């Protein structure tokens, strides 16, 4: 409830509540809690559902996700989570190469859950096959996935090549350089890139503050990025979406229409809510954000 109420300060009108890899008990309680809030009522930005990130990830590309809880995907276990969530899981990140015969991928697609490839060691060919079975997006492109190489194209290469696959990308300038952001947006075009913050609950806390994320200690760096104190590895960000928009336009030199689409109509289309979200049209929700020239938020409606 606190997150929903305050995220409007950065111009966000709707979002997915996101989990991380944890034990079955913790994840079950987490999705049940989100469902309770959604159904009991809350103030602020609309919770469109749950983004279930983990535990169906690859060990090598797990990032800051706690490895002791990573498991192979099964339809049976996911059904239990979705039952606890009362059907509110709308988006799942998983390493689809771990999904035997794409069973969970196909089940999710058939039941209205968007499948996004992420924290994955999939090859280019495996990504193409997952796309053919209904995978629709990639989670934080460049990060937590096989890189591009001219002899091993990887997931990054698949993100570029599969034109009609959506791709999230963290636009803080730390997870990916400005040049990498520009390359991705200019290659992908205006319709399939999705800006994300990858922000943690530590958003808004002071520089140098320490927190527990998935059982691991993290610290907030001066640039707003979060790092594991044990290894120094990136563990997310504290980025505000309006600042991400400014970074894309002013630092990464991405055309404004590409940048604004990435945080409005593109994610709405990916989630299948573009009939009421993502653009100002007759009959849609009147979600309006007023920005100053410096991208600071004047008002969110």
PLM regions: where:
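Divalent metal-binding pocket/active-site signature
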Residues: 52, 59-154
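Conserved, mostly hydrophobic/aromatic
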Residues: 7, 52, 108, 138, ...
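C-terminal cap of metal-dependent C-N hydrolases
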Residues: 269, 274, 279-301
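Divalent metal-dependent hydrolysis catalytic cores, especially in the metallo-beta-lactamase
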Residues: 2-30, 45-58, 85-97, 113-116, ...
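Generic structural signal for well-ordered alpha-helices
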Residues: 3-4, 28-35, 78, 105, ...
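Active-site-adjacent C-terminal substructures of enzyme catalytic domains
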Residues: 126-258, 263, 269-274, 294-295
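Short, electropositive alpha-helical surface patch
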Residues: 27-41, 105-114, 255-256, 260
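Residue-level marker for buried hydrophobic side chains located in beta-strands
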Residues: 116, 193-196, 289
């Amino acid at each position: 409830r606190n997150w929903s109420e305050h995220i409007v300060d950065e111009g966000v009108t709707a979002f997915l509540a996101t989990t991380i890899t944890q034990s079955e008990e913790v994840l079950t309680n987490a999705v049940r809690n989100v469902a309770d809030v959604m159904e009991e009522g809350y103030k602020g930005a609309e919770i469109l559902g749950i983004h279930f990130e983990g535990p169906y990830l690859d060990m090598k590309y797990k990032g800051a996700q706690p490895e002791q809880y990573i498991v192979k995907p099964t339809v049976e276990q996911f059904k239990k989570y979705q039952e606890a969530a009362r059907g509110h899981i709308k988006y799942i990140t998983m390493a689809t190469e771990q999904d035997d015969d794409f069973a969970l991928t196909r089940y999710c697609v058939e039941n209205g859950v968007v499948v996004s490839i992420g924290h994955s060691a999939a090859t280019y060919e495996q990504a193409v096959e997952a796309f053919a079975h209904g995978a629709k997006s990639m989670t934080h492109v460049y990060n937590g996935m096989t890189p591009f190489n001219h002899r091993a194209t990887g997931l990054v290469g698949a993100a570029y090549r599969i034109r009609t696959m959506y791709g999230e990308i963290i636009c803080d300038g730390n997870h990916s350089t400005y040049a990498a952001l520009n390359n991705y947006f200019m290659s992908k075009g205006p319709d399939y890139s999705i800006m994300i913050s990858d922000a943690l609950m530590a958003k808004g806390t002071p520089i140098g503050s320490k927190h527990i994320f998935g059982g691991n200690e993290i610290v907030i760096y001066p640039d707003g990025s979060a790092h594991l104190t044990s290894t120094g590895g990136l563990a997310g960000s504290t980025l505000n979406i309006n600042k991400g928009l400014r970074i894309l336009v002013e630092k990464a030199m991405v055309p404004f229409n590409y940048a604004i689409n990435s945080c409005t109509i593109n994610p709405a289309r990916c989630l299948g809510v573009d009939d009421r979200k993502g653009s100002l049209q007759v009959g849609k929700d009147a979600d309006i954000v007023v920005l100053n020239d410096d991208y600071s938020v004047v008002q969110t409606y």
